[in-house]
Amino acid sequence: MKRLPLLLALALFACSETSTPLPSTPTVDPVTSTSVPPTPIPVTPTPTQIPPTDTPSSAGTFPDPNAYTWQLLVSGLQRPNDLQADGSGRLFVIEKVGRIRIMQDGQLLEASFLDITDRVGSSGNEQGLLGLAFHPQYAQNGRFFVNYTDKNGDTSISRFQVSDDPNVADPASEVQILGVDQPFANHNGGVLVFGPDGYLYAGLGDGGSQGDPFGNAQNTGVLLGKILRLDVDSAEPYAVPADNPFGNEIWHYGLRNPWRISFDKLTDALYIGDVGAGEWEEIDFLEAGSPGGTNFGWDFREGAHEHEGNAPDGLTDPVAEYSHSEGGCSVTGGYVYRGSMPEWNGIYLYGDYCTGFIWGLIRSDNGFQDQMLFDTDVNITSFGQDETGEIYLVGDRGGVYRLERIQ
């Protein structure tokens, strides 16, 4: 295990700007409402236009959302917050308290795939079992990785092994590959994803409180407020890839709380949903093959807007953003659709935890365009994507849904 301590004096935790309130007693998410007209949500100021590739249409049009629904598949989960596929047709859903459950053939299996509630600290709204990633060769090596906060509130990125039973992991197989001290109970990030290069990417928030009081996001000697990139195959517990820009685990920086990131299955482009502070939520984007070292601006900027001032040159603005004045509070990054409905091909779907709104983002001949498509009743904690490219919605109150065409 590698552990990077933060030798910082703790202050009293005050996070009215930063901590998203979550329901304390979960109930089943109601079935979503999908009859909202496609009202465009403006982005101001307009981010720098990026030349389009692989667009669903040259005009940048969206499907009529009234012809689609988010179909409830299972309910009764305990505060689910992530969904991943292992390539077998099964879906794996994280419960914040420290369990991973299996969805198979449309049913939620009773037994947990993994139960590590004995080592997960989940008392804080942004703490718990937060991320899951299956190794690209999972079918051969049975390895998967999780990101959780431990009983001390610190981040643990750990590797586990499946048992001889494919529906049961071995909780005693844990190898902690990276531990990071957390100065506060919020902004833990939590996402894990394997990139097209085979490396493991991890999103970490800026350490919490409010306003990044220790300047972590802009400090390339500290892992907080970053996207990390680890080679988990070449050494134990991992190696730092030779082309990481700062000679350490950091790949990109200047992020507040990158709760969910994903790579487009077709183009390998990277999308980042970075949770904002008091005013703006943002989606960041990088072309496939982009080098490391991108500075996304926090806390000089919140979204594309000045926050602390004195911003240096070379910051990368988001390609989409929305204001809290529209009712939102916390962006949940999603996925680019690559499933069986061609009219959705190439559209990146993302949402907001508080409003339940779901937007589409596409690259057209005019650059990036976004539009609010669905008004749901779901506190959106995550999206998921299976091996066929279909997209799922995960709700804090216990439901999992799939985007489907109304017959």
Predicted region positions:
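Surface-exposed loop and turn segments in beta-propeller and other repeat-based domains
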Residues: A111-N125, A172-G189, V232-W251, F296-E326
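Ser/Thr-rich, Proline-interspersed low-complexity disordered segments
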Residues: C15-P65
